[in-house]
Every structure is written in structure tokens, then in C-alpha cells.
Amino acid sequence: MKIGVIGSGNIGATAARLFAGAGHEVAVSNSRGGAGLESLIAELGGRARATGIEEAARFGEVVLVAVPFGKYETLPAEAFGGKVVIDAGNYYPQRDGNFARLDGGETTSSELVASHLKGARLVKGFNTIWSEHLKQQGDTGLPLEERRAIFIAGDDEGAKRTAARLVEEIGFAAVDTGPLGEGGRRQQVGTAVYNKELNAREAARVLSAG
């Protein structure tokens, strides 16, 4: 599969390594048009390339967006049309500035991203795990129920299945928290699943209790 990765920070670079290691072709982008990614691309080998943001979005059948939430409106929306987009962002007011609709609980960050990327098949995911845990805790040798959980949410069931397959290929278990709105709220900063080291069995128990 071809995967575009928007953002080369901790989550983006780690995910790119894992996707390439699982045999996928990866285009990694940053705000500098791919400049400065030479060492990462060399590490990933022939399955990876450095690109600009729009090129990475057009390249990927799946696109992982791992940039600060406050920059979401700078994404070239047309390039994401029809793509399965995994939004790994979280809203941090101290970093992103205040968004009244989020502060008032009217909507969620991923719903705002989805409204900007019209035509994209958006899934919330990869936002509740530290990058070091993403790097270290995947294990394809474990049964799914014993693997570290990565939570996903979305309104497009087919897109969620695609995201879940990628999660499983890199050694984790996808745990569905529901539709983009309700499910996204269950993944927000400070919730019972945010950055908690839960396997899939434990995650299901926590979600059912909530």
C-alpha cells in the first residue's frame, strides 16, 4: 500500500518507520517541502521518499496527518479527496491557541479537520500513544487481545477497517471507540484511554465502564 505521512515529528517519523518496515511504500513530508529528511529516508531505504505535503497526500492511498492541530487549515484540502486519512492530532490550547467551538464542547478537533478535508474518509487514530511506546510496544507475535491498543474512531466503516489493518500490521490492536464525534471525544486529552498502556482486552473493559 502507498502511505503518505504528513509531519516528520515524533509520531510521524515513528509511524513512517513502522509502515515501511511492514512493507508499505511511504512518502514523508514536512513544512519545508521534505528538506531535512535525508537521514530518515536513508534509514527507511528504497520504500521511502521525501516530498512536500501536497505530494504526500496525493501519493497515499492512506494518509497519516501528524501535525499540530492548530495548523490543520493549512492542509491542501483538494489533495485529500477520496483518501483514507488518519488524524493523529490532539488539541492543546497552550500550543494551538484557543478554539471557541472546542473549548465549549460544541465539536471535536477531528470533526473540524474532517470539515476542512471535505471528501476525505477521516479516521481518528494514533493520537493516544506516546511515540516511544509506538516505537517499542508493537508485537505481531501476540494475539490481538494481548497487544497494546491503538484507538480509532470514524464515521466511514471501510476507512476504519483499513486503518485497523495497518494498526495490526505494525503489531498493535485497533480498538474502535465509535463515530468520529462521540468516539473522538473518548480519545481526547485527559480521558481514560489517553496515553494509557492498555492491551485490547483492558481497553474494551475501560471503554465499557465509561
Show which residues each predicted segment covers:
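Rossmann-like NAD(P)-binding element
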Residues: 45-97
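Active-site-lining helix/loop region of Rossmann-like oxidoreductase modules
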Residues: 145-210
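General beta-strand structural signal in soluble alpha/beta enzymes
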Residues: 50, 121-125, 175-177
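Short, hinge-like loop/turn segments at secondary-structure boundaries
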Residues: 43-47, 103-104, 139-143, 192-195
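NAD(P)+-binding Rossmann beta1-loop-alpha1 motif at the extreme N-terminus of oxidoreductases
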Residues: 1-43
